[in-house]
Amino acid sequence: MNDMVVAQLSPEVVLGELKKQGVTHVVWLPDSETNWLYLLMKAEPTLTLVTVPREGLAMSIAAGLAAGGAKPVILIQNTGLMESGDSIRGWLIGLDIPIVLMVGLRGWTRHGPTKDTAATFTEPFLNAFRIDYYLVENDADASRIAMAFDQARATKRPVAVLVGDEFHGFNK
């Protein structure tokens, strides 16, 4: 098998992990990197997609959904994560909301120095808020999504999944 195929993160695998965790709502800000996952989520009858105009609003919406008994996940990019600091502090951490933030790690690379400050500051940002995180780069890492959900439940805190690769087209 071609190593390039093995090393990809397929949207089907990510969606499968979300379904295994019983996710009911995806609160997200659409972007070009999540297009393939979006097409699958849109067709999935067990998911409700909640689009937000700014990432900071995702935190309060997800907190309300969780308080009402739903099981949301937040899907945003790292730049939006950093824009959302006060909402994370007040809504998620302040209210003990056990939620997974799936964060696109824009600008990150395993192949040499990271040149984009969006990627450079993501981990220090998460550390400042004491938010634990898991890196998911390919399908072999997908079980870390379940680990993040388990940890969020156990700690009643947000936990991040850093998506270190763009979702690739349908692998069918």
Features from the language model and the residues they span:
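Thiamine diphosphate
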Residues: 1-172
